[in-house]
Amino acid sequence: MKYKVNWIKTKEGNGIKAGNTLIVKITDARIVSGWIAKKTFYGRKMKQVGQSKNTLSFKLKERKGKRTIPYKKGNYLLKVSAFDKKNKNQQWSDEFEVI
Protein backbone atom coordinates (compact mmCIF):
# COMPACT_ATOMS: atom_id res chain seq x y z
CA MET A 1 0.00 0.00 0.00
CA LYS A 2 1.19 3.50 -0.82
CA TYR A 3 0.14 6.72 0.91
CA LYS A 4 -0.26 9.96 -1.07
CA VAL A 5 -1.57 13.36 0.06
CA ASN A 6 -1.99 16.67 -1.81
CA TRP A 7 0.55 18.66 0.25
CA ILE A 8 2.28 21.85 -0.76
CA LYS A 9 5.87 22.32 0.41
CA THR A 10 6.51 25.05 3.00
CA LYS A 11 9.55 26.12 5.04
CA GLU A 12 8.31 24.00 7.94
CA GLY A 13 7.60 20.91 5.78
CA ASN A 14 4.18 19.75 4.61
CA GLY A 15 1.41 22.31 4.38
CA ILE A 16 -1.97 23.14 2.87
CA LYS A 17 -3.96 26.35 2.50
CA ALA A 18 -6.85 27.01 4.90
CA GLY A 19 -10.26 26.21 3.43
CA ASN A 20 -8.95 23.67 0.90
CA THR A 21 -9.74 19.96 0.86
CA LEU A 22 -7.10 17.53 2.12
CA ILE A 23 -7.22 14.36 -0.01
CA VAL A 24 -5.52 11.14 1.15
CA LYS A 25 -5.24 8.36 -1.45
CA ILE A 26 -4.07 4.87 -0.56
CA THR A 27 -3.59 2.27 -3.27
CA ASP A 28 -4.64 -1.38 -2.74
CA ALA A 29 -6.61 -0.56 0.43
CA ARG A 30 -9.93 -2.12 1.35
CA ILE A 31 -10.81 0.19 4.26
CA VAL A 32 -9.22 3.52 5.19
CA SER A 33 -9.93 5.55 8.32
CA GLY A 34 -8.25 8.60 9.78
CA TRP A 35 -8.53 11.80 11.75
CA ILE A 36 -7.22 15.36 11.96
CA ALA A 37 -6.33 17.06 15.24
CA LYS A 38 -4.95 20.51 16.09
CA LYS A 39 -1.76 20.53 18.13
CA THR A 40 -2.19 22.59 21.31
CA PHE A 41 -0.10 23.28 24.39
CA TYR A 42 -2.05 20.65 26.37
CA GLY A 43 -1.95 17.90 23.70
CA ARG A 44 -4.34 17.81 20.77
CA LYS A 45 -7.92 18.75 19.92
CA MET A 46 -9.81 16.46 17.54
CA LYS A 47 -11.24 18.25 14.50
CA GLN A 48 -12.48 15.63 12.00
CA VAL A 49 -12.79 11.87 11.61
CA GLY A 50 -13.29 10.03 8.32
CA GLN A 51 -13.70 6.54 6.88
CA SER A 52 -13.83 5.34 3.28
CA LYS A 53 -12.78 2.57 0.88
CA ASN A 54 -9.51 3.91 -0.52
CA THR A 55 -9.69 7.74 -0.49
CA LEU A 56 -10.22 10.05 2.48
CA SER A 57 -11.05 13.72 2.09
CA PHE A 58 -11.21 16.37 4.79
CA LYS A 59 -12.55 19.88 4.15
CA LEU A 60 -10.45 22.23 6.24
CA LYS A 61 -13.46 24.26 7.39
CA GLU A 62 -15.47 24.35 10.60
CA ARG A 63 -18.85 25.69 11.73
CA LYS A 64 -19.00 28.71 14.02
CA GLY A 65 -22.64 29.36 14.80
CA LYS A 66 -24.36 29.62 11.42
CA ARG A 67 -21.21 30.46 9.47
CA THR A 68 -18.59 28.18 7.93
CA ILE A 69 -15.04 29.46 8.40
CA PRO A 70 -11.65 28.00 7.37
CA TYR A 71 -9.33 26.40 9.93
CA LYS A 72 -7.03 28.74 11.82
CA LYS A 73 -3.35 28.83 10.93
CA GLY A 74 -1.21 26.45 12.94
CA ASN A 75 0.13 22.92 13.21
CA TYR A 76 -2.17 19.95 12.77
CA LEU A 77 -1.76 16.17 12.98
CA LEU A 78 -3.06 13.64 10.44
CA LYS A 79 -3.34 9.98 11.42
CA VAL A 80 -4.41 7.37 8.83
CA SER A 81 -4.93 3.61 9.15
CA ALA A 82 -5.63 1.24 6.24
CA PHE A 83 -6.41 -2.46 5.81
CA ASP A 84 -5.64 -4.39 2.61
CA LYS A 85 -7.32 -7.47 1.10
CA LYS A 86 -5.42 -9.81 3.45
CA ASN A 87 -6.55 -7.73 6.49
CA LYS A 88 -3.04 -6.44 7.16
CA ASN A 89 -3.01 -3.06 8.87
CA GLN A 90 -0.70 -0.18 8.03
CA GLN A 91 -0.65 3.20 9.77
CA TRP A 92 0.73 6.62 8.83
CA SER A 93 1.12 9.72 10.97
CA ASP A 94 1.94 13.12 9.53
CA GLU A 95 2.30 16.62 10.90
CA PHE A 96 1.29 19.51 8.65
CA GLU A 97 0.81 23.25 8.73
CA VAL A 98 -2.28 25.22 7.68
CA ILE A 99 -1.25 28.48 6.02
Feature-to-residue mapping (PLM):
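Short, compositionally biased P/S/T/A/G/V-rich stretches that sit at domain boundaries
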Residues: M1-I23
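Short proline/glycine-enriched turn/loop motifs at strand-loop junctions of beta-rich domains
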Residues: I26-S33
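Conserved aromatic beta-strand anchor motif in extracellular beta-sandwich/beta-rich domains
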Residues: G34-F41
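A glycine-anchored, Pro-Gly-centered beta-turn/N-cap motif
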Residues: S52, R63, K72-Y76
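Signal that preferentially marks extracellular ectodomain short beta-strand elements
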Residues: S57-Y71
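Beta-strand-rich extracellular modules
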Residues: S81-K85
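Extracellular and select intracellular beta-sandwich modules with Ser/Thr-enriched
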Residues: K88-D94
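Interdomain boundary/hinge segments at the C-termini of tandem beta-sandwich modules
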Residues: F96-I99
